[in-house]
Design a protein with these regions (language model features):
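C-terminal non-catalytic interaction modules
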Residues: 1-60
Length: 60
């Protein structure tokens, strides 16, 4: 179910262009163990200009 929430918040982040939803998406993808999909919100945050070091830490 965490993977479903990850997708939900990722799509919500795309719709609203709101960083909070991308961070929530990362949390749920990590809880589900889906290390492939976690890159989707990370890439969006990178495009939005988020700090590269923070994003690298979140990718671990």
């Amino acid at each position: 179910i965490d993977n479903d929430y990850g997708i939900h918040f990722y799509l919500k982040g795309l719709a609203y262009q709101d960083k909070r939803y991308f961070y929530e998406s990362i949390k749920h993808f990590k809880l589900s163990g889906d290390l492939f999909s976690v890159r989707l919100p990370l890439d969006q945050l990178r495009e939005m200009g988020e700090d590269e070091q923070i994003l690298d830490l979140l990718a671990l």
